[in-house]
Amino acid sequence: MALHARHLPSSLGDQAPHLLILHGLLGSSDNWQTLGKRYAASHHVWMLDARNHGRSPHDPIHTYEAMAQDVVDFMDTQGIAKASLLGHSMGGKTVLLLSQLHPGRVDKLVIADIAPRAYIPHHGPIFDALLATDPASAPSRDAVQSLLSKALNGDPVLVPFLMKGLHRLKEGGFTWRFNVPVLHATLQDVVGHIELGLNTLPALFIRGSESDYVSDDDLDLLEDHFLHMDHHTIQGAGHWLHAQAPDEFFAVTADFLA
């Protein structure tokens, strides 16, 4: 599958290393543009839309094996032999699997607020809300947002985040850029377990103190698998730590990637 990507060339020129950024579930490359510009001071930055997200193609298959292969195929197409990878949530699990299957293609990896374990799905209300909207016949963005807000109790973070995925159709009406039916049907795969082996790549695991996605026990388990591992906790940040604490997130990750 040919993924859509946003490219920010480095000011350092051709000798700069490559950094690929992979977003989380229901996100897109758009979520990373501000931080991407900062990383471009030292790296050629590629912000990818995962399959069934953003401007990348839709497909009934949505597994980590498929997503990891999509990234490798993208690197092959762009002539990128090796790159550092930064993944948040679903993107982080994709990076974990890719580093297991293709370690020679990875320089360093940054995993943002996710562990390889299986999670109990908690996205039911989100997908119920998305499936209940009929964006194709909606008269305005405000109408769609009103429906989402009502279904999600006016969540001040989640509703604006989801609305970023709403796209106006030329023929009128709207559509979701993310593939709601397929992502809903494959949610068990998205929250599933990633099998880890011994990994010798430099790895940074960064989490938010207010998020329950990465526990101390998770970090202990990860240290059994990653021989060269660092970890950092951003105090006061939740699961969307890169948006809630962008300066600290950038400082810690940029130092690691240098």
Each predicted region: which residue ranges?
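Active-site loop/oxyanion-hole signature of alpha/beta-hydrolase fold enzymes
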Residues: 8-12, 33-40, 46-90, 251
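Serine-hydrolase catalytic-loop signature spanning alpha/beta hydrolases and amidase-signature enzymes
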Residues: 26-34
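Alpha/beta-hydrolase fold catalytic core
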Residues: 1-20, 40-43, 80-81, 188, ...
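Flexible "cap/lid" loop of the alpha/beta hydrolase fold
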Residues: 100, 107-139
